[in-house]
Amino acid sequence: MILLPCNQIGWLVNENKKFFGNKSDVPIRDKRRKNTMAKKTRAERNFKFETLQLHVGQEQPDPVTDARAVPIYQTSSYVFRNCEHAAARFGLTDAGNIYGRLTNPTEDVFEKRIAALEGGVAALAVASGAAAATYVFQNLAHAGDHIVAAKNIYGGTYNLLAHTLPEYGVTATFVDPFNYEEVENAIQENTKAIHVETLGNPNSDVVDIEKLASIAHAHKIPLVVDNTFATPYLVRPIEYGADIVFHSATKFIGGHGTTIGGVIIDSGNFDWEASGKFPSLVEPNPSYHGVSFVKAAGKAAFVTKIRAILLRDTGATISPFHAFIFLQGLETLSLRVERHVQNALKVVEYLNNHPLVEKVNHPSVSDDPEQQRLYKKYFPNGGGSIFTFEIKGGAEAAKKFIDNLELFSLLANVADVKSLVIHPASTTHSQLNDEELADQGIKQNTIRLSIGTENIDDIIEDLDEAFKTLQE
């Protein structure tokens, strides 16, 4: 069995703070410094998002080769200097890499960078967004426990909570995330988390993270937020009280539809010990010689336990190459997301005024005053490049429209630089029954769009040409 040393657990926490630390730590002012004209250190400079996405985790060139780009450390394992060194690694007295299933230097840079961008203390990259969601809930809930989740979440996460985890004794109650009384009433003594998405899937409805966090914390449980559709460039849920954030990195982080991966970010703010509901994080773990993750890893206890236990035993490890691709994606995240949003808002306006469209499901044109308020609060610069609209003519018209698009690709992914389209009821959400489809706001005439970064005139022309075929 491969074990993660206790001091390596602490190292995982400390490494995340070497460059910029948390947002609350930046800039750090040394009040003892008398010379006010002295050059600021990196930690004292209040670097913005666009700078963080390029530099966190690799502040200096590679120490071995002087390469400025992050190297791909394509290795399964690491050499020990001698038997004594190997024993020290396994014996919890020397920090460092042991085996590629647990840690890798390329992955480490990606984890530091996304943690900094989200404002967390630590992160863990894994093989897929589905693995990220699964690990989060497995780390929180065990047989006999319960999760409260919003109805308007990704279909894969819905199936995980509704069908897969119940086979292991973990149940879920799905609620309207805008009915706070319903959310409160769904919480039981054995509830271990509330889960929502920043932007609902697939209609991009905006949840009130701050309100839901206050409900969760009143019951001494964490708020878990899937921030895939928003990205930390538009919203940082931790700033509004979220405790755990995760992403399908396949989407905006990668951005080009080439690479599968996921990532979990630990805010470091939830007090697992004071809650009294999470003994596996607090009490001694027998597979690590009685280590308590809260005591050993401090604020990074949550993701450290996933790495040390779940990743060790179930192995949904991200590859170094995929971590490298995601680092490339992060370097242009702000630029791409700005263009995605700019294009999407113009498409929303176009569709909202089209005679063959019954309704556009996007918060910017919602007739719900609460949605308008939340959209302005959480997305002051706009957001929601993945959304749906309902076309006149039912399912037949929806499918004909999709089949006549040329620029849009018909596929199951979203958040690609290329514009994408799909008919959710017959594909991505086809495993849901009629009631579940209604809960998620999906009808037979619903079409989901993921607006890319092409020239906006070309995007709208493609939509216009497809609409013309319905009038023939």
Language-model features, listed with the residues they occupy:
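Conserved PLP-enzyme active-site core in the AAT-like
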Residues: 42-44, 60-61, 123-354, 361
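PLP-dependent enzyme catalytic core of the Aspartate aminotransferase-like
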Residues: 22, 38-39, 121, 162, ...
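Short, Lys/Arg-enriched N-terminal segments with co-localized hydrophobic residues
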Residues: 18, 23-36
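Short conserved active-site loop signatures built around small residues
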Residues: 38-73, 264
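Conserved C-terminal alpha-helix-loop-beta "cap" of PLP-dependent enzymes
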Residues: 337, 345, 349-352, 356-447, ...
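Conserved N-terminal alpha-helix of the aminotransferase class I/II PLP-enzyme fold
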Residues: 82-131, 156-163
